[in-house]
Amino acid sequence: MTSPEQVGVRREATDAEARALASGLRLRILRLTLDEPLTNREIAEALGLNPATALHHVRTLVDTGFLEALEPRRGRRGAREIPYRSTGRSWYMSTPVGASSLLEAFLAEIATVPEPDRDLTRLGLRLPAAELEELRARLWELVQEFHDRPRDPEAEPWSLFVALHPDTSQRPRRSP
């Protein structure tokens, strides 16, 4: 049987998957472990967490299949440590509660990026429904195209955050 991940199709997350992805901290753990497996200790250090707190989140991600445990290795002082790597499954999930956790993860990550290294823009639009759908489709196709390209382990890692939403800063238009 072919999984949605194998054919590149998004699917609705189960309740457990949606709960796992509803945490900005868990999304940051997935990002940290996307290209390099990290132990619980390394994850805790990278995020400034207590190792027990990190382990709680790691276990949730392992239980839902978003992280996989690799072969144990010897860490500092010969202790047995388990490295974890992101499975990439979260890309193929659609959740009704994911937007706030995505924003939470983005804000935490962008706060650590020096101002000159940020490339941000905002754009106000007025589009008819058909053009709005065209914009959504073209944005999705572009992002999916870059997602599907082979990852170059030697390339510098970058992050992309895209948000399209109704503009609530505009005053309502008056009727003629």
Q: What would you call each of these model-derived segments?
A:
Residues M1-Q6, S90-A105, A111-P176:
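C-terminal regulatory/oligomerization modules of transcriptional regulators
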Residues L67-E68:
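Short hydrophobic beta-strand motif reused across regulatory alpha/beta modules
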